């Protein structure tokens, strides 16, 4: 009986072993793939707790980016303060002569600033445009968002609003401004933004009068030229570990603009846009083209429709090029998980600075995109770590 019992137990164990070994290979492959998928999900950071903080700024000003990044790292819900700090950091020569404000007058020599900030949670937007006499325009834009039911204030009234809140009025024009304007005037007022007027704006300073419509010629000049260090706008995007976005932009306005012109920094969706449910985007380039097409808004909506950040960035730039073949500029797109991409056109190269997004690359690094007039190279990065173009590491103080 004992021998029979032992044999029975051995038979049962043998059957169990055979059953386990006979599991189809497909099932084993399924379990392996499931583990890979779980690992991939973690890598992409789909869970709220797995989103890594990210600070992106256009162009290659690492100092301003680092100042904004340090604010973002200080604690809970600091995206708003971070983008404001980034904009304020560029009110000096380290962010270029035009962004400093004193080298970007209008045709009458006036220096005016514009700025905007957007909350990705509430979708509230605050902006000022054509504001003179107040240096930190981003603070006034933030005040528009916080203390009014409006979205944009302009001109002298924006300055008056700022003064009513205690912001100091400052005379921004100096000798440098006057020299820049004098040199421009002696060069036949070139470049300028007039067209279809008489005398020819390509050769004369005006005053101008309209040409008859049958004499109109389009285009009379190329799009507004943008080069590294010679641009008038800078944008910041901040994403925290909770998936909260803030975006902001500040500009001194296009150099030698017609007085009264409003730029893309003040127009919702042109230079900045964010929605916590989807992601955010910042754009830089020819502001008048950006205002016509709202690329930052389009990029976010493209992601809402299912496009990845790299697809959204490239699609937006291609759309701009279809209507403006000489367009100069770029767009940087970030989804709600912190995956980012950039595309550009009309420049030799577009640079943007990234802090965070990767635990082992948390400090500011400069990403570079080589741009072609018609063909756009896309940089794709973020938590999944794809970088087709790897720049040389830049030393950060």
Swiss-Prot record:
Domain of life from the UniProt record: Eukaryota
Record InterPro entries: Ntn_hydrolases_N, Peptidase_T2
Keywords annotated in UniProt: Disulfide bond, Signal
Signal peptide range in chain numbering: 1-22
Record carries keyword Disulfide bond: yes
Disulfide bonds: 90-95, 189-205, 344-371
Gene3D superfamilies recorded: (Glycosyl)asparaginase
Entry similarity comment: Belongs to the Ntn-hydrolase family.
Protein name: L-asparaginase-like protein GM15681
